[in-house]
Amino acid sequence: MPATPSFMKLKVDHKTVLCRDLNTYRALRDFLLNSGYSPVYETDRVGEERTATATFACLSSLTGERLAVVLGMSAPNEVSHAQAPFAYGFAGKPQKDAQTYMQHLALRTNDVEKLKSHLESKGAAFLTPIYKDKDSFGPLLQSFTRELFDDEWFFIEFVQRDYDADTVGAGGTQFVQNTVKSLYVSKQEEFREWEKTGKKRKFLDGVPAKDRTKLLQEIFANTEPKGYVQTVAPIARNVSLG
């Protein structure tokens, strides 16, 4: 068996959870701040003129885990994509009691350009180009896939931090405002297309059907810490990693 390329040796960078309403958003933010997490990014509004999100991101200095909490803000005549799980349901059914939804998992690589090219060569589809910017600690490169599953709103982010992200700790900004806004606009355009057509262009549509599960397993099996991916509900519902 050939050795795993270094760019495929992935590590969880952060995960992003969507909130149904302002009360849920505030409660989750308050809980995290009272559980040893420190803020690393916050904005009250970023997006388009009519729809947007509020975002709070934090870091646990004890575990190194980063979490982003997002509230979608819809307009009277337009739903924010960040409200899609609550407006349209997920896991194949309406979800009137759901207060949160795990929107995406960010996986860190040492070379996002090689990783993106590798996956695209197999037929995988990305929603965005590679955004190149800097946070408080150094260069930050990010690219986002199209959604993975028909009955979910879940996607993957691949991120490259050109500094030791495991040792910087709290303090400073570890997300980039321009990238957050660019992602919002791209996701909202993708969501409008889905509302119009009822069809999703998914991450693995261009991969031969027989190879799709294998490619996901290749990504997730090479992700540290082992077992973390299985705790992400949309993945656990759709992919067998055993």
Roles of regions detected by a PLM:
Residues D44-R45:
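Catalytic cores of carbohydrate-active enzymes
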Residues M1-Y41, R50-G242:
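Glyoxalase I/VOC metalloenzyme domain signal
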